[in-house]
A protein has these predicted regions:
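A structured beta-alpha segment of the ubiquitous adenosine-cofactor-binding alpha/beta core
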Residues: 14-22, 37, 54
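Active-site flanking residues adjacent to catalytic metal/cofactor-binding acidic residues
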Residues: 8-9, 67, 163
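Short, charged/polar "capping" segments at the starts of alpha-helices
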Residues: 12-17, 73-75, 117-121
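NAD(P)-binding Rossmann-fold cofactor-contacting core
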Residues: 1-17
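Rossmann-like NAD(P)(H) cofactor-binding subdomain of soluble oxidoreductases
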Residues: 28, 36-99
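Structural motif
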Residues: 30-32, 111
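A short, aliphatic-rich alpha-helical micro-motif
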Residues: 20-26, 105
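Internal alpha-helical scaffold of NAD(P)-dependent oxidoreductase catalytic cores
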Residues: 4, 80-91, 96, 100-177
Length: 177
């Protein structure tokens, strides 16, 4: 593999190429955009939709697009039906903001959801990059999306649990040091 990395960002100061150049000269596109929470707890997928619309308009190549953002189960299928010419794979990131580079290099597993032909192509890239040392789970869109949601929920549950234990400990004079 030869990695010729191109970066497109809406902030042109961070871009190395236009979106059209990036999309049409890439075999695999990593798409990481925010999916902020709405007041009711749902997620806002308008940014993902907008970027996929733009890619759909300018794509002349056969690139695979990795959706890395947190999406509720069923969302990638929705986008796959809305943009049938796009080859989508849901590939959630399990990165912390503080250690994103380190977390990417030291992944415990890679989740790929989508059409088997597309996930196989992406798995080849990851196997090459990580020298077959990181387990790769290939599944469908919905399962991959649920794995990501379960991971996020489990982390939140652990934090809530420890906060509760701290409150109990404080009431009974537990020494946390």
């Amino acid at each position: 593999y030869k990695a010729d990395i191109k970066i497109y960002d809406k902030n042109s100061a961070l871009s190395t190429h236009s979106i059209k150049e990036t999309v049409n000269s890439s075999n695999i596109i990593f798409l990481s955009v925010p999916t902020p929470a709405n007041i009711d707890g749902s997620i806002d997928i308008r940014i993902v939709d907008s970027v996929l619309s733009e890619i759909n308009r300018c794509q002349e190549s056969d690139s695979i697009i990795l959706l890395r953002s947190t999406l509720i189960p069923g969302t990638t299928q929705f986008f796959s039906e809305k943009f049938p010419k796009l080859k989508l794979v849901f590939n959630p990131e399990f990165l912390t903001e503080r250690n994103a580079n380190k977390d990417f290099i030291n992944q415990s597993r890679i989740i790929l959801g989508g059409d088997k032909k597309n996930t196989n192509s992406v798995a080849e890239l990851y196997n090459w990059r990580f020298q077959d040392k990181v387990p790769i789970i290939q599944t469908n869109f919905q399962t991959a999306e649920l794995i990501k949601y379960m991971n996020n929920t489990f982390l939140a549950t652990k934090i809530s649990f420890m906060n509760e234990m701290k409150m109990i400990g404080d009431k009974i004079n537990v020494n946390w040091d």
